Amino acid sequence: MPKSKVRKKNDFTITSVSRTPVKVKVGPSSVWFVTLFVGLMLIGLVWLMVFQLAALGTQAPTALHWMAQLGPWNYAIAFAFMITGLLLTMRWH
């Protein structure tokens, strides 16, 4: 019975691709980024306070008459500022 031939081995071996995630080291966030998200949250808070305390009611000052005309949209604007600031905190290092 004939013998089978021995095959040559390749000079290189194929390495399997690693599936483990590699954590990228990122430095701390810059000062302007922290200022931005804290500022956005404070703007939303101040917007809500001004609307509740000054622009609501029949005795609204003429400077805030435009805010009183927005009505319930003031809540959406204030919370949009605050939520945007909150979402930016997730990118903070």
Swiss-Prot record:
Keywords: Cell cycle, Cell division, Cell membrane, Membrane, Transmembrane, Transmembrane helix
InterPro entries, A to Z: CrgA
Job of this protein: Involved in cell division.
Gene Ontology process terms (BP): cell division
Transmembrane segments: 31-51, 70-90
Location relative to the cell: Cell membrane
Domain of life: Bacteria
Bilayer topology annotation: Multi-pass membrane protein
Protein name in UniProt: Cell division protein CrgA
Gene that specifies this protein: crgA
GO cellular component, one term: plasma membrane
Family membership noted in the UniProt record: Belongs to the CrgA family.
Keyword Cell membrane: yes
Record has Transmembrane as a keyword: yes
Primary residence: membrane
Organism the protein comes from: Mycobacterium leprae (strain TN)
